[in-house]
Amino acid sequence: MSAAAAPAAEGEDAPVPPSSEKEPEMPGPREESEEEEEDDEDDDEEDEEEEKEKSLIVEGKREKKKVERLTMQVSSLQREPFTVTQGKGQKLCEIERIHFFLSKKKPDELRNLHKLLYNRPGTVSSLKKNVGQFSGFPFEKGSTQYKKKEEMLKKFRNAMLKSICEVLDLERSGVNSELVKRILNFLMHPKPSGKPLPKSKKSSSKGSKKERNSSGTTRKSKQTKCPEILSDESSSDEDEKKNKEESSEDEEKESEEEQPPKKTSKKEKAKQKATAKSKKSVKSANVKKADSSTTKKNQKSSKKESESEDSSDDEPLIKKLKKPPTDEELKETVKKLLADANLEEVTMKQICKEVYENYPAYDLTERKDFIKTTVKELIS
């Protein structure tokens, strides 16, 4: 025990070296590599921050992007000469009704039709001329070009399709697909509808005025027939009066001539009686002639009346039966037009115009208020 305690005591008595005198620990190779990597990362971050700061600073003007213009394509379209290919049908300008409708349309209203026919909008001066020269599409039905035209027409609104139908003298009733088929079928082989030329409103109004004037003249003629007969009777009375006056003057002259010879023979008295009888017979003959003349005139007037009645009987029944449309008929036409029309686009003026076109023989301007009220009732 004493031997073990002795070294321990020796150890306790030995001096402890100070901490500052310890040797510095040398870093290993791994620690050096990690420090180098950290330094590199710090340098990279600093470089990135500097680049960001540089990018924020605007130096000079920004480079503009060059605009690519399709000048070559436009010039190629302009250089292509305009040619009208001959179709299978008749030229639109040679069809009377279509020529009439074309003359009434403005050039701006024909742009879409021109584009449909020739794949170009056309100029204002040549729109009507080019549309009139069209005689049908050169391609067949069901081809790719036909389908392209069909797709082009389907993009049009109903109002535009109906205006095209109006120019081409086609029915304007139906759905979009029906109108498209109708227009394409006609444009493949244009031909006249066979209907007569529509009368303009001015001519129809003049015609109605003439009809009114003619009816007024017939009434006047009927009224003037009676005065003519009366004038004949009065003329016969005047003739009788004149004859009486002449006979009285003749008697006075004869009496004056007979006065100087006071003595008259029986023969002279008989002669006087005979002359008086002859004068009476002349008077009766004059009266009969006047009566016969009046009867002849009456017969002539009755013949004229019968001839006018016969001529009116010879007229066709359609002329006699033609009457302006009733309120119910106008209401039905307005119903049909509203059913086919697009209420968001159609105006009251267009509906009134279409109603007038359904009845071109009559002037319906006086019944415009009734048409408007019916439209409002049907819409509400």
Curated annotation (Swiss-Prot):
Disulfide bonds: none annotated. The modification Phosphoserine is found at residues 20, 33, 55, 76, 125-126, 163, 205, 208, 214, 231, 234-236, 247-248, 255, 292-293, 301, 306, 308, 311-312. One of its GO terms (molecular function) is DNA binding. The keyword Phosphoprotein applies. It comes from Mus musculus (Mouse). Residues 1-67, 188-330 are annotated as: Disordered. A motif (Nuclear localization signal) lies at residues 209-225. Found in a mRNA splicing-dependent exon junction complex (EJC) with DEK, RBM8A, RNPS1, SRRM1 and ALYREF/THOC4. Interacts with histones H2A, H2B, H3, H4, acetylated histone H4, non-phosphorylated DAXX and HDAC2. Component of the B-WICH complex, at least composed of SMARCA5/SNF2H, BAZ1B/WSTF, SF3B1, DEK, MYO1C, ERCC6, MYBBP1A and DDX21. Binds DNA. Its main location: nucleus. The lineage of its organism: Eukaryota, Metazoa, Chordata, Craniata, Vertebrata. Residues 342-356, 372-376 bind DNA. Keywords: ADP-ribosylation, Chromatin regulator, DNA-binding, Nucleus, Phosphoprotein. The keyword DNA-binding applies. Residues 32-51, 247-258 have a biased composition (Acidic residues). Residues 20-31, 52-67 have a biased composition (Basic and acidic residues). Involved in chromatin organization. PANTHER family: DEK PROTEIN, PROTEIN DEK. Residues 324-380 form the DEK-C domain. One of its GO terms (biological process) is regulation of double-strand break repair via nonhomologous end joining. It is found in: Nucleus. Residues 153-187 form the SAP domain. This is Protein DEK. Phosphorylated by CK2. Phosphorylation fluctuates during the cell cycle with a moderate peak during G(1) phase, and weakens the binding of DEK to DNA. Residues 198-207, 263-282 have a biased composition (Basic residues). PROSITE patterns: DEK_C. The modification ADP-ribosylserine is found at S284. The gene is Dek. GO terms for cellular component: B-WICH complex; contractile muscle fiber; nucleolus; nucleoplasm; nucleus.
